Amino acid sequence: MLTEKGRGYDVAIKNPERFHGASPFDIETGKGAPAAPGTPPKYQDVMGETLLKLAREDANIVGITAAMPAGTGLNILEDALPNQFFDVGIAEEHAVLFAAGMATSGFHPVCAIYSTFLQRA
């Protein structure tokens, strides 16, 4: 059985990850509602921007995720430095072992996984 994300809502079908954990949005366009003035940045955005800054300075810094690039902020790294980004799919155990292998080869992996999914690792 395969999950079909967004079934019945064209905007979600075109971008299923965007609606995986949706916050308020315009139902016509699918665009997210603007943040209220003074709202602090999202943790994942701070993480992604910080990792990107570090990765630009060191090509051995890589980001690894298990099918959650936007939710972890690694989509920022993916967009800017795709050769330093790895999405292993829904395989947290592989992400952790992949990171360990890369570390033994001189890389500096950042493995971003939701804690609830680490039970699978």
What function would you assign to each model-found segment?
Residues M1-A121:
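Thiamine diphosphate
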